[in-house]
Amino acid sequence: MEFNLNADKEGWISEFLASRRTTRDFSKQPVSPELIDELLKDFLTAPSWSNTRPFKVAIATGERRDRLSAEFQKRWSVLSAALRGNLWKKIKLVLRWDGLPTSNWSISRPYVAELRPRSQRVGKELYEFIGIQRGDRKRRDEQWGKNYDFFGAPVEMFIYIHKSLHIFAANDAGLALENLIL
């Protein structure tokens, strides 16, 4: 999608923001370190609490990115097999925790009741669009596994926040990420 930015046109920012989309398949073309640096400059212009920018960025490209992806995919393979397995496989997974990387924040909470229908609708539309039936667990797992290949993106960025600042640092990182994405 190409966007013709005309800042002289009234409502251009709303039009630009409405053009946002999600990408699930990236080109393998490498991104130059100079372009990454330019994007990080924009990333760092976001406001933050006391202008402290309580986050760090780790960037993986090339062989390092591929090693991380391979490790994440290996863990996803173990986790998805255990989730489809019997109770013993699930207990073994919890005891060994050969699953996905951990986080300071729980990301597996269920949506609140009023948001759940929208979440389910969007998920259903995505899987219908890419031709995966609800009952096709194998293809659904394969599609989910693409998260751990970063959807083929040649650059992966990991954002780390200062845990002592709790949600405040996460908010600040979110603002910076919006700059990066835009």
What does each model-identified segment do?
Residues M1-L182:
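Acidic, surface-exposed loops and disordered segments
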